[in-house]
């Protein structure tokens, strides 16, 4: 499964739960790991969860919604839900090439921003609660790479969404 994510152009890393299992994983925000890296990592961590390293290499950033407050922060916002997590959702967006986003815990109530130097857990990983991570909207590039693999998803196949203006404005306010 990890190789399929890599074939899709997504920078990946093995996770112990939600914690990266390799010490130098952050460098893969700017470069994709090699197939040799991935082979060694999963040989050393055969039961690891799978994570996407956010940033330029993968071309994505993620809003990580957890708990009760997250849905309230997004109540009147239009977002493409993409992954159901054990305790919320991940909303994936194409990373604009001209931006320097920073990770932010509590970006909005119940929402964390995961970007360059951040990572998120992806299907078919399991949450500590036992719940499986499931794609709601399977990214188009991943669907092509996974054509011969059965990956759980419940909705449609689309490219990563462009971030809406309101979200880019909120992110810009972080830098002020």
Residue ranges and their predicted role:
Residues 1-176:
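Conserved phosphate/metal-binding and DNA-contacting active-site motifs used
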């Amino acid at each position: 499964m990890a190789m399929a994510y890599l074939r899709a152009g997504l920078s990946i890393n093995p996770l112990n739960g939600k914690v990266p299992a390799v010490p130098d994983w952050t460098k893969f925000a700017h470069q994709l790991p090699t197939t040799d890296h991935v082979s060694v990592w999963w040989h050393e961590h055969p039961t690891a969860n799978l994570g996407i390293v956010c940033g330029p290499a993968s071309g994505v950033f993620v809003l990580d919604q957890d708990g009760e407050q997250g849905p309230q922060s997004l109540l009147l916002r239009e977002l493409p839900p993409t992954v159901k997590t054990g305790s919320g959702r991940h909303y994936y967006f194409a990373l604009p090439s001209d931006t320097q986003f920073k990770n932010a815990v509590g970006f909005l109530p119940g929402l964390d921003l995961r970007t360059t130097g951040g990572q998120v857990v992806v299907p078919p990983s399991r949450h500590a609660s036992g719940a499986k991570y499931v794609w709601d909207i399977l990214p188009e590039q991943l669907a092509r790479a996974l054509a011969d693999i059965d990956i759980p998803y419940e909705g449609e196949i689309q490219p990563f969404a462009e971030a809406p203006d309101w979200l880019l404005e909120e992110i810009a306010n972080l830098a002020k």
